[in-house]
Amino acid sequence: MKTKLRKNDEVIVIAGSYKGTKGTILKVLPKQQRVQVKGVNVVTKHVKPSQSNSEGSIQNFEAPIHISNVAYVHKSGPKDKSGIASKISYEKRKDKKVRIARKTGKVI
């Protein structure tokens, strides 16, 4: 399934235990329909010692969440701190395909 969200887009979580949390997309996994969002769904992984890693460690990282649980946040200007949750559409302008925030109608 094609996704309209991209890396470094600002999103808000709209469902789940992190509902209302804002963050930026670190990674998009289109085949699994998931995204990794900074500061959301942080899990702890215990790494065993190995030849390459002589000491074991405990690492925290963001696990991916389903793409339907996030919404794009469109900021109208540099002073706009909160932004508006909006869907994304595409339009052709001057032989280029551009992303547009549906609520504001502005190019992303």
Curated annotation (Swiss-Prot):
PROSITE patterns: RIBOSOMAL_L24. SUPFAM superfamilies: Translation proteins SH3-like domain. GO terms for biological process: translation. One of its GO terms (molecular function) is structural constituent of ribosome. Keywords: Ribonucleoprotein, Ribosomal protein, RNA-binding, rRNA-binding. InterPro entries: KOW, Rib_uL2_dom2, Ribosomal_uL24, Ribosomal_uL24_CS, Ribosomal_uL24_KOW, Translation_prot_SH3-like_sf. Pfam families: KOW (PF00467), ribosomal_L24 (PF17136). This is Large ribosomal subunit protein uL24. It comes from Mycoplasmopsis pulmonis (strain UAB CTIP). The gene is rplX.
